From Swiss-Prot:
The chain crosses the membrane at residues 4-24, 33-53. InterPro entries: DUF1328 (IPR009760). It is found in: Cell membrane. The keyword Cell membrane applies. Keywords: Cell membrane, Membrane, Transmembrane, Transmembrane helix. It comes from Xanthomonas campestris pv. campestris (strain ATCC 33913 / DSM 3586 / NCPPB 528 / LMG 568 / P 25). NCBIfam families: PRK13682.2-1. Belongs to the UPF0391 family. GO terms for cellular component: plasma membrane. Its main location: membrane. HAMAP family: UPF0391. Pfam families: DUF1328. This is UPF0391 membrane protein XCC1302. Coiled coil: none annotated.
Length: 57
């Protein structure tokens, strides 16, 4: 998911540099959402992994 966030951020930066303000804003919004969604999923999986690892061992 972080990979897609970086791709959308690059698209947003290029679109902004070329003057496509609306498209740049939308791409950056998608990039921001994907970045935070990826971080939240990673944290949840880390916590679940730590709690399950304690129960298994």
């Amino acid at each position: 998911m972080i990979k897609w966030a970086i791709i959308f951020a690059i698209i947003g930066l290029i679109a902004g540099a070329l003057g496509f303000g609306g498209m740049a804003g939308a791409a950056m919004g998608i990039a921001k959402f994907l970045f935070w969604a990826g971080i939240i999923i990673a944290i949840v999986l880390f916590v679940l992994g730590m709690t399950i690892a304690k129960k298994v061992t």
